[in-house]
């Protein structure tokens, strides 16, 4: 790791169909073994399913679902005099987005529908309506931070 300066963040290109950078990040996270075309097919068909069910712009639904999953606080371990405390800290905007994307994908993978398109569409709809595993993960994270509010003075 260089001490001179931090590595520059690379901007992802907007996706082909909707022209949305966040959607590209989502596809990149979903991608396995560099198979981007497979990830694109899964995401686009999931968004088509969502559009068929709610009669709204699919990207709008995607962003609403993502906003409902983004955490505002999380806990980080801090060692103080032999004891480890779970210290609540605010989450940076870039990390919020990354966590929300990761949680949505993991929640979709753990669902019981047959295809990944169905799972992803179901999880996006659930997240849009503030329910589902990804939203539960966010609420659990917030509860953990709230429970450890007493240690917030150990913040860095």
From Swiss-Prot:
Keywords: Ribonucleoprotein, Ribosomal protein, RNA-binding, rRNA-binding, tRNA-binding. The keyword Metal-binding does not apply. GO terms for biological process: translation. Pfam families: Ribosomal_S7. It comes from the Bacteria. One of its GO terms (molecular function) is rRNA binding. One of its GO terms (cellular component) is small ribosomal subunit. NCBIfam families: rpsG_bact. Belongs to the universal ribosomal protein uS7 family. One of the primary rRNA binding proteins, it binds directly to 16S rRNA where it nucleates assembly of the head domain of the 30S subunit. Is located at the subunit interface close to the decoding center, probably blocks exit of the E-site tRNA. Part of the 30S ribosomal subunit. Contacts proteins S9 and S11. This is Small ribosomal subunit protein uS7. It comes from Rhodobacter capsulatus (Rhodopseudomonas capsulata).
């Amino acid at each position: 790791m260089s001490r001179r300066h931090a590595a520059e963040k690379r901007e992802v290109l907007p996706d082909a169909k909707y022209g949305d950078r966040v959607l590209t990040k989502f596809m990149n996270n979903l991608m396995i073994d560099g198979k981007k075309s497979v990830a694109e097919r899964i995401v686009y068909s999931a968004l088509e399913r969502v559009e068929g069910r709610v009669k709204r712009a699919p990207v709008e639904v995607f962003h609403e679902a993502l906003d409902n999953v983004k955490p505002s606080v999380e806990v980080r371990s801090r060692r103080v005099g032999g004891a480890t405390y779970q210290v609540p800290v605010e989450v940076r905007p870039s990390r919020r987005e990354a966590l929300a994307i990761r949680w949505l994908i993991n929640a979709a993978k753990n669902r019981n529908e047959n295809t990944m398109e169905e799972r992803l569409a179901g999880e996006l709809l659930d997240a849009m309506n503030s329910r589902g595993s990804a939203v539960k993960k966010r609420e659990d994270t917030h509860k953990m931070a709230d429970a450890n509010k007493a240690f917030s003075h150990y913040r860095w």
